[in-house]
């Protein structure tokens, strides 16, 4: 079944400009709906780790993007005083108390997750936003006003502090999702975007911005890399001088590395102190 869905989605993607809510064929509508439903249940993911490396299911991401071409905006009542007008229903629109109990997570008003996102057990959603295609694994905290972008992958026991932004793949369109691995801490108002991978047990300080063009400077080695924070890194914001010494440009600085045992025993503030 998955192979058949993939084939339908890939073929439709090549002609995506031709589709609209009025002319989309039934088999395409059904295929996209099945993919979104599986994303919603967590049985299908945009990306997963295989033998230590992240593998992106590009066809699943295409299905998410196609879904926007196949649906019209509709009015979505939400309580007595609020309404929305969108193509994607909210994840919890039809949830009962039993559904929430079975899910095993907390949703603090007015948190919003879109249909097609997955929320794992023991996740706490403070007033925040989780977009379609995103996967938030068990035990994680999405703190107040944090946003988890479309198709982003959040690992187990991750803390996304207040106002954190995890970039999506839809606007602007990106090749790969942003990934935060297990047991990471992302400090308040930090932004991780453009398919950057933060590997497990890392700590990102408050106000650190990392995209694919951001220089990541390792203080211990002097090496500059892009797009990936190594496992167990403690990262703060910094600057690197230009070659002519006339100006400096923003960078992210790896100030130290810690193993999982140290990470578990040491407080966040202590790790961030130099």
UniProtKB/Swiss-Prot annotation:
GO terms for biological process: diaminopimelate biosynthetic process; lysine biosynthetic process via diaminopimelate. This is 2,3,4,5-tetrahydropyridine-2,6-dicarboxylate N-succinyltransferase. One of its GO terms (molecular function) is nucleotidyltransferase activity. Homotrimer. Substrate binds at residues 106, 143. Pfam families: Hexapep_2, THDPS_N_2. The keyword Translocase does not apply. It is found in: Cytoplasm. It is an enzyme of class 2 (transferase). It catalyses: (S)-2,3,4,5-tetrahydrodipicolinate + succinyl-CoA + H2O = (S)-2-succinylamino-6-oxoheptanedioate + CoA. Keywords: Acyltransferase, Amino-acid biosynthesis, Cytoplasm, Diaminopimelate biosynthesis, Lysine biosynthesis, Repeat, Transferase. Belongs to the transferase hexapeptide repeat family. The keyword Cytoplasm applies.
